């Protein structure tokens, strides 16, 4: 099939690779424009742009697809289908209508649960035991289009980074399967029941509130690994918790109290025991390594964000 691929981050790269490996004709790759990054703020191409250039596929990164010129250029590609994976731009109706089979999206949840920008993180935060990938026909609504196929994946204590990588691989394989036999995957309208929305992650959500239950904080740590990173503050410094375990607590300590020399921290229900942490500007380390160079003794009271 003659395809335009539209994607930007690491999540999208496996789908691009899978389309090429399956023998499809990639007419163009659309991705977000290069962004300033690093200390020097040099313009850095996205993971999809880098991979497309390695593969020798023409790359386009319009700032918008709303203007008539961009839409005419897209229509002139004479596509069978456009495949979309975390592209990051709204597709107006002329773009959705241009390919013969429309635009198919790789979405990182089991729709209609977790429509929106952050389905992986929201599934972890909610304690969902399973999530997955949906191949859907795009329409103007936010992830509201009919579904062609789904595949489930257990969450199993994974971080957002680990789960995203797994969903990227399974979504790539599922998209290739769908394209190989479109008549065998008729679109099914999403049910009206069970709709939830995966709002974009606000950095303010990443500060740990020890007045939450230990299980919820453990999910917060996994949901925000690798970014933006769940953190607490001590002596004016942010300490990121990269991994922790939720443990029982039977003492009278207030939430936020460090209750032993292993950095076990009391929560409103239970306690958390960090296993991997990171100081600002430092490499990740074990909790023991942190404590050898940064005193947080038993009895220390760690602050939680003010409640509004």
From Swiss-Prot:
Disulfide bonds: none annotated. Signal peptide: none annotated. Gene3D superfamilies: 3.40.50.12230. Keywords: Protein biosynthesis, Transferase. GO terms for cellular component: cytosol. Its EC number is 2.1.2.9. It catalyses: L-methionyl-tRNA(fMet) + (6R)-10-formyltetrahydrofolate = N-formyl-L-methionyl-tRNA(fMet) + (6S)-5,6,7,8-tetrahydrofolate + H(+). It holds the Pfam family Formyl_trans_N. Transmembrane segments: none annotated. (6S)-5,6,7,8-tetrahydrofolate binds at residues 109-112. GO terms for molecular function: methionyl-tRNA formyltransferase activity. CDD domains: FMT_core_Met-tRNA-FMT_N, Met_tRNA_FMT_C. It is an enzyme of class 2 (transferase). The keyword Protein biosynthesis applies. InterPro entries: Fmt, Formyl_trans_C, Formyl_transf_N, Formyl_transf_N_sf, Formyl_transferase-like_C_sf, Met-tRNA-FMT_C, Met-tRNA-FMT_N. Belongs to the Fmt family. Attaches a formyl group to the free amino group of methionyl-tRNA(fMet). The formyl group appears to play a dual role in the initiator identity of N-formylmethionyl-tRNA by promoting its recognition by IF2 and preventing the misappropriation of this tRNA by the elongation apparatus. This is Methionyl-tRNA formyltransferase. It comes from Rhizorhabdus wittichii (strain DSM 6014 / CCUG 31198 / JCM 15750 / NBRC 105917 / EY 4224 / RW1) (Sphingomonas wittichii).
